[in-house]
Amino acid sequence: MIGRMVGLEPSSRSGVLEECRECRAIVMKGDGVQTPLHKGDSILGGEGACLMRYAAWTLISAVDVVYCSLETRESVSLTFNPDGQVIVVPFMFKGYNIAALPTTKFGDLKKDTKQIENVVSFLRSDICYAVWEFLVSSVQYKDDDRFERLFDERMRGYLRNISEGTSKVYMRGNKTFSELLEMVCGRMLECSGRVAGGGA
């Protein structure tokens, strides 16, 4: 089972994203990289006026979480323009096939009986952990495994409980996959509003 978040940006190569002075498109600079369909793209006839204004956005994988695997598939690091905009579009994959689109409701998933069992298992157990990986993907364990053991003890159960609760709402309601992820983020990052001593 693969859970993947995808961001909308005009390139997936490493470098710094800058704004084009001509058309205000976000262009990636560095290591000889130039954004596809931008000025100078040889596929469209070489040098010429900026073509980015006519281009569709390109999908890049921001998170590629592969379950049932010990291998890290891919890691992407980008520096975004402060004035730029990133739209996160969630997809869920099973193998090489898309299991859920942002607009997919649970009733739509039930129509495909071949993969519904795996999808339900992922939603109940791992959907919150996939979101956690997207939000906090750079946690490093240094020196020894004490922090990792503390995380396993405290956070994994917490994240699994959120996955269980939010997946039940998704499976019995009329929410889309995108709304499910918003619900997961809200539950995962919420504060109880209580402080030591019982005050509010």
UniProtKB/Swiss-Prot annotation:
Stated family? Belongs to the UPF0329 family.
Q: What is this protein called?
A: UPF0329 protein ECU06_1670
Which organism was this protein described from?
Answer: Encephalitozoon cuniculi (strain GB-M1)
